[in-house]
Amino acid sequence: MGVIDLITRVDSICKKYEKYDINRQRDANVSGDDAFSRLYSAVEYALETVLQKTEDLSSETNKAKAVAMNAEIRRTKARLLEGIPKLQRLSLKKVKGLSKEELDARNDLVLSLRDKIEAIPESSAPVVGGWEASTSYSNIRFDTNVSDDRIGSEYFQPTGESDQFKQEYEMKRIKQARLDYIAEGLDTLKNMAQDINEELDRQEPLMDEIDTKIDKAATDLKSTNVRLKDTVTKLRSSRNFCIDIILLCILLGIAAFIYNSVK
């Protein structure tokens, strides 16, 4: 196979699968209002961050820190899975500048992203310094005749370092729980804001139509008032003319009466 044939084959393969490139879809978006691309990028970035944390967790030697990291990974994984249904709804929304094939490919992108999120490992880091089985010390024997006075309640009394470690761990746990609560609240507010924005976008054509109808009604009412004013003016003029005729007839009658009396 020659170089030209190889380049042609690579170009055909790239063209076949370019509809699955979310970055190209974002660049090709003309309207600039693609909520799917924004949410997909955010979830993808969070997924990369979680995967990096899982790699750090595998090499973590501090047991308390490893437990905290593992809990954070589980919470983030659950949060990412909660965003998948919204991504699926947004993938069905038509976007100006994208073809039908690219819109159909978005569902495949969401399914692939969900599989990656579900594949995130949740195992904690290995415990360092714990009890491990070893065949090199199979000859070690434990003496069961140790006096109870040597292993009493004082042997298990907490030290200053252990109390300090416990306090620090409890403070970090409480602080992390509060931060998680705040983060969940912010996520909820963010989702509400996005939903409100989408609803406003859907209601905007209706508001424009209502404004148009109001303007038309105001124009019709103004023209009706003008016609009504003209009609009232005409009626008033006709009434004044009739009154003038009646008064003239009365005056003529009085003049005729006086003339007949004098004659």
UniProtKB/Swiss-Prot annotation:
Task: Spell out the SUPFAM superfamilies in the cross-references.
Answer: SNARE fusion complex
Q: One cellular component GO annotation, for this chain's record?
A: membrane
Q: Spell out the subcellular localization from the entry.
A: Membrane
User: What is the membrane topology listed in the Swiss-Prot or TrEMBL record?
Assistant: Single-pass type IV membrane protein
Q: Which GO terms describe its molecular function?
A: SNAP receptor activity
Tell me one GO biological process term: intracellular protein transport
Q: Does the keyword Phosphoprotein apply?
A: yes
UniProt note on tissues of expression: Expressed in root, leaf, stem, flower and silique.
Q: Where is the t-SNARE coiled-coil homology domain?
A: 169-231
Which residues does the entry place in the Vesicular compartment? 262-263
One Pfam assignment: SNARE
Q: In terms of domain of life, where is this protein from?
A: Eukaryota
Q: Where are the transmembrane segments?
A: 241-261
The alphabetized UniProt keywords are:
Coiled coil, Membrane, Phosphoprotein, Protein transport, Transmembrane, Transmembrane helix, Transport
In terms of InterPro entries, this protein maps to: Syntaxin/epimorphin_CS (IPR006012), T_SNARE_dom (IPR000727)
Main subcellular location of this protein, as a coarse class: membrane
- Extract the PROSITE patterns matched here: SYNTAXIN (PS00914), T_SNARE (PS50192)
* Residue intervals on the Cytoplasmic side: 1-240
In the record, which positions carry Phosphoserine? S12
Protein's job: Vesicle trafficking protein that functions in the secretory pathway.
Q: How does it assemble?
A: Part of the t-SNARE complex.
Q: Which family does it belong to?
A: Belongs to the syntaxin family.
Please report the name of this protein according to its UniProt entry.
Syntaxin-73
Q: Which organism is it from?
A: Arabidopsis thaliana (Mouse-ear cress)
Name of the encoding gene: SYP73
